[in-house]
Amino acid sequence: MMDISCATSAILFILSNILSIVSLKKYQNRSNFDYEAFTELDPTHIQEEWEYRNEHRNLELSAGVINAVAWFSLLIPMLQVVWVQSVSGTRQLALHVTVVVLAFGAATTELIGRVLYTGSTNAAQWLAKDFNLDNWLSEDSNDEIGWRTLEMIHVVVRGMLLWIDALEWLALFGISMLLFVSIQTQKDRLLGRRWALFGVILGLFSIVDFAADVLRLESWRSFSEIAFVTTAINRVILIPGWLFWLGYQLPQAKALARKQSTTVAEGMQASSVVVAKDATEEQTESATLT
């Protein structure tokens, strides 16, 4: 039986990345793009860019929103895994709390960042469509400074989103590695060791993705291609595969964890009874001697 939360999260990651790939390929294959004109902030080229963005905004917006929901939906499987691996909070508490913090941080950051980016791009598209961006120095100057300013703001906002995406991959690396340690050090394993090793592969790809995102600032074209490939592999293959595999194991693992938790509780209760009995006997002996 498949855990629904794992399957849902995996499907959302696949869908968001397919939409992102379609959106990016359309953007890359448009005929009017000129990298030199882009870096020179050529006003004519900038206006063409904003016309394209206004026409294709819904596809990019849909991909971004679904991606944010996918990261947030990842919280539910991670909370279940942490509860199972910690045996209801009785094992390696610090390690498993760290996993929860990383998962919650990645999900929250993506959601907030996506909301801020969507709001700023919608406002920028409104500016490009209805505001005067041609004549700032004088009424008929046709200086087009407004277009240059708008494009610079857009690049800065995109940079914010780039760093948010990079930090998400760093968080996923931490989650996968900590879960590997948790499973590897468990005597009676509830989740499979092979699944944990698959998570290590996911973590290594996540680090490569993080590095490629950061190094885009050094060489945008080269590292954007690397980031595109690693992100596609992560979101379409590794993360969904990791989640589907987890989904098949999780129901049985939760049942075993409940048994272990009950055993631990019974053991603690029995120990308490023995301690209380010993204390009572000591008090009785003391009273007799007195």
Report the location of each language-model feature:
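Hydrophobic, aromatic-enriched alpha-helical segments typical of multi-pass transmembrane helices
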Residues: 1-267
